[in-house]
Amino acid sequence: MAKEKFERNKPHVNVGTIGHVDHGKTTLTAALTRVCSEVFGSARVDFDKIDSAPEEKARGITINTAHVEYDSNIRHYAHVDCPGHADYVKNMITGAAQMDGAILVCSAADGPMPQTREHILLSRQVGVPYIVVFLNKADMVDDAELLELVEMEVRDLLSTYDFPGDDTPIIIGSALMALNGEDTNELGTSAVKKLVETLDTYIPEPVRAIDRPFLMPIEDVFSISGRGTVVTGRVERGIVKIQEEIEIVGLRPTTKTTCTGVEMFRKLLDEGRAGENCGVLLRGTKRDEVERGQVLAKPGTIKPHTKFEAEVYVLSKEEGGRHTPFFKGYRPQFYFRTTDVTGSCELPEGVEMVMPGDNIKMVVTLIKPIAMEDGLRFAIREGGRTVGAGVVAKIIE
C-alpha cells in the first residue's frame, strides 16, 4: 500500500489525555479516533494498540507513549496517551511530547483522585496552557446531583493550581459508549464530537516556532580571518536576518552585536530560520567574547537568570541514574541547551532526601546565569552522566 500523503493544509495542534489510572484515558483516546474517522474521515486506532504503547527514549529516559492522530473540520490533532502514571511524569517533565492543551479525564463515578490532582499540578509546573475536562463514565451515574458535585470538585481543583476552573469547559459523557458506537442520552458519540468541537474553540492555534522571536543556542565559535567571528547552532525559533541587531545572552553580561552574515552548508544566505543549522557572523565581536552555552536572541526577548523553581524527575537505577538518594546541598551540573552549569538544590520543606525514580519540586541556584524562561527543559548530570530531567517552572531571580 502506498504511503498516505501528509496533508499540511490544516493547522496542527498537540494534545494529550491526562488523569487518574483507570478513569478512561485510553478508552477516550480510542473513541476520539473512532468518532473522528466516522465524522471527519481520519483513521481509527483500536484500544489494544494504544494500550500497548511502544517504549521510546527521550534524553536517555525510557517512556511508554502512544501517539495517535485525528482530524476535526478545521484542525489536525496529534494526541499522546501514556499507559502508566510514571510515564506521564517523565513525559511532561522532559517535554518529550509538548502539549498545546490537555484533556483531563475524570471518572464521574469516582470523582477526582490523587493522580487527577498530580497531573493538574504537573500541567501547571511544565506550562500546559489549556485544560479541557471530560467527565467520563457518566452512564454509570444516575444521580444528577452527584454529577454536579464531581464537576464542582474538578473546577475547584483546577482553580487551586491557577487554571480558570470556573471557565473551563467540562463535557459529560461515556468514552466506552462512544467507542462502541452508542449514544444513549447523547453521552456517547455526541459527547466525543462535542469534545472535539471544544478543543477546536477553546485551545487557540499555537504560535509556530518561526513566528516567535529569534533565538539560537550557540554550539561552536570560530574565527575567520578577515571576516570576524562566526557562531554556529540550530535556530530554535524565529528568523535572523542580515544587518539585524542581536543580543548575546547568558554566562556573562549581555552584549549587543549585529548579524553581518548567515551561512548554511558553506552557502551564504540572507536569513536563518527556525529548525536550520547555520553559522551567524557577528560584527565586531572577538572570538573570546562568546562561548558555547550562550544564546543569540532578538534584543530584549530573553534574560539571564541564576535562581529558579523547577519540577524534576530523578532517573531510576534501571534507567542508568543514581543508585542512591541525594540530600539537601546536592550540587550537580545542570545542562541547558548546549552546556553544563553547576548549581545547588534546595529541597521543599520537610523533604530530607530524594530517591531515584522520584519527581520533586526544587529551587536551583546556578553559579553562572543562563538565558532562561519558564518552560525551558534541562538535564541534571554528574560527570557527563544524566541522572535527572527537569523543567523551569518559575524564575526567581
Swiss-Prot record:
Alphabetic keyword roster: Cytoplasm, Elongation factor, GTP-binding, Hydrolase, Magnesium, Metal-binding, Nucleotide-binding, Protein biosynthesis
Enzyme Commission number(s): 3.6.5.3
Gene3D superfamilies: P-loop containing nucleotide triphosphate hydrolases (3.40.50.300), Translation factors (2.40.30.10)
Region G4, residue ranges: 136-139
Reactions performed catalytically: GTP + H2O = GDP + phosphate + H(+)
Region (G1) residue spans: 19-26
Binding-site list for GTP: 19-26, 81-85, 136-139
Region (G5): 174-176
Binding positions for Mg(2+) per the UniProt entry: T26
UniProt cross-references to InterPro entries, sorted A to Z: EF-Tu_GTP-bd (IPR041709), EF-Tu_GTPase (IPR050055), EFTu-like_2 (IPR004161), EFTU_2 (IPR033720), G_TR_CS (IPR031157), P-loop_NTPase (IPR027417), Small_GTP-bd (IPR005225), T_Tr_GTP-bd_dom (IPR000795)
Location of the protein in the cell: Cytoplasm
Main location, first listed in the record: cytoplasm
Taxonomic superkingdom: Bacteria
Gene Ontology MF terms: GTP binding; GTPase activity; guanosine tetraphosphate binding; translation elongation factor activity
Chain ranges of the tr-type G domain: 10-207
GO cellular component: cytosol
A Pfam family reported for this protein in Swiss-Prot or TrEMBL: GTP_EFTU_D3
Chain segments carrying region G2: 60-64
Annotated region described as G3, given as residue ranges: 81-84
Functional summary from the UniProt entry: GTP hydrolase that promotes the GTP-dependent binding of aminoacyl-tRNA to the A-site of ribosomes during protein biosynthesis.
Listed HAMAP family: EF_Tu_B (MF_00118_B)
PANTHER family per record: ELONGATION FACTOR TU, MITOCHONDRIAL (PTHR43721:SF22), ELONGATION FACTOR TU-RELATED (PTHR43721)
Family: Belongs to the TRAFAC class translation factor GTPase superfamily. Classic translation factor GTPase family. EF-Tu/EF-1A subfamily.
Subunit and partners: Monomer.
The protein's name in its UniProt record: Elongation factor Tu
Organism name: Ectopseudomonas mendocina (strain ymp) (Pseudomonas mendocina)
